[in-house]
Amino acid sequence: MIEQPAACRIHVEALGPTFEAQAEQWAQRLNLPLQVADGEFALQVGEQGLQLQQLGPDAPGPVRVDFVEGGAAHRRLYGGGSGQMIAKAVGIAQGVRPRVLDATAGLGKDAFVLASLGCEMSLIERQPLIGALLEDGLARAAEDFDVAPIVARMKLLKGNSIEVMRNWEGEPPQVIYLDPMFPHREKTALVKKEMRLFRPLVGDDPDAPALLEAALALATHRVVVKRPRKAPCIEGPKPSHALDGKSSRYDIYPKKALKA
């Protein structure tokens, strides 16, 4: 069953007869109904792939994962390369491209940036609905000539991040990247469409301290936690230092140096 607050009513919807079979497959996989009268969210299947649409008169537009066009393409082409703060945070340097686990993958935007810079990425997304969007986006990107080599470096894992890390099999990641959902209490803050859409489904991350603990136990070289710039550190061990941006920062928990 979908991991979600009970109040959320979600159904799967085909945006045309040609997508009905795919819609039925997603409904079965996610244990969701097809077309209900009073739904709050619709997981829609159409020409542009899988998208999540909040329903109602004031709802924002649909959210989908698109690594080929839009913001992901612009950041890939003009985003600053290895000079980006996230690249510095995970330890990318000349001759150094660490193996990274993004344990809070979401829509995969940060993981895609790191993969485009040459990192081998593992991604964990615990919310099945968001995981479905990410899986669909990766599959469509794999068909694009320019982007296929990048997403080939992105391996999607399903499940609870803490449990996956505690029971990790095989070679451990050198770096683990965490971006847990943080409570936005400022009523005037402009929250991105994705966050407004996902918060009712996912909620905040009260288990962030356990997430950090599991990451520190598994990563061989460092753990990086992305936080709102003025937010407190995650409860537990303190970071050795942080990289500050305009709206967010990266708390760094080093274990040993990354070398070429």
UniProtKB/Swiss-Prot annotation:
Biological source species: Pseudomonas fluorescens (strain Pf0-1)
Gene3D superfamilies for the chain: Vaccinia Virus protein VP39
Protein name per its UniProtKB record: Ribosomal RNA small subunit methyltransferase J
The UniProt record lists the keyword Methyltransferase: yes
A molecular function (GO) term: rRNA (guanine-N2-)-methyltransferase activity
Gene assigned in the entry: rsmJ
UniProt record similarity statement: Belongs to the methyltransferase superfamily. RsmJ family.
Pfam families to which the protein is assigned, alphabetical: SAM_MT
Compartment annotation: Cytoplasm
Keywords, alphabetical: Cytoplasm, Methyltransferase, rRNA processing, S-adenosyl-L-methionine, Transferase
GO terms under cellular component: cytoplasm
